[in-house]
Amino acid sequence: MAEIYVSTDVEADGPIPGPHSMLSFASAAYTADKQLIGTFSANLELLPDAKGHPLTMKWWKTEPEAWAACRQDLQDPKTEMKEYVKWVKKLPGKAVFVAYPAGFDFTFMFWYMMKFTGESPFSWSALDMKTFAMALSGLPYRSCIKPKLPKDWFDDLPHTHVALDDALEQGALFCNMLSLWQQHRQALGLPNEVMPAVEPEEAAVPGVSPRISSE
């Protein structure tokens, strides 16, 4: 089964979930050849007893349009995360979570999925585009910020801090990087294809399933 790359962007009011809330999220699902096969986005109600981190809220004041966009048509997190997991499961391939950097976005998404649905359709794993950029570019890891990457890696898409815009822009970037990686494989005489997933992932901790009770 071919992999489907689920480019995901999260907007939040702090650095970690629980004390702070995920305000908005969006995913754009791409095939390896950059066909967009679907999107999912939602603006979420705040978590009970959570509050914005002062530094994050200071930053949000510099992005009033993006703030307004993520605070309209608010949805219940439990309902939306259940719908999101259903959407991921219906994708026509093995879903791979993709983000730049994955450490931030996957932390929020994994926490919300586990809390409100008890499972993650991505298992425990996320593909970090920053690490991928390091491997492709030869730049040191901390230098792998978007302004330092080759301009021809990017499509002419906006980065607005509106989750869906950013998920689409990031997904196109990933597919361009994936194409470059495939070219490198071809130059080495290796098959010019994305290797298919073979078996479902085992839990990261022996004896622990990635599914837990949502009660």
Regions found by a protein language model. Give the residues of each.
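Residue-level signal for well-ordered alpha-helical scaffold segments within enzymatic catalytic domains
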Residues: 32, 83-86, 90, 107, ...
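Substrate-recognition/cap helix-loop segment adjacent to the acidic, metal-dependent catalytic center
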Residues: 88, 103-124
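Active-site-proximal helix-loop-helix substrate-binding element of RNase H-like nuclease domains
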Residues: 46, 57-61, 127-168
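Acidic, Mg2+-coordinating catalytic module of metal-dependent nucleases/exonucleases
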Residues: 96-102, 107-108, 145-206
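Acidic active-site catalytic centers that drive phospho-/nucleotidyl reactions
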Residues: 9-11, 31, 105, 128, ...
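Short His-centered aromatic/hydrophobic patch
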Residues: 9, 120-121, 133
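Substrate-binding/catalytic groove segments of enzymes
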Residues: 116-121, 139-147, 181
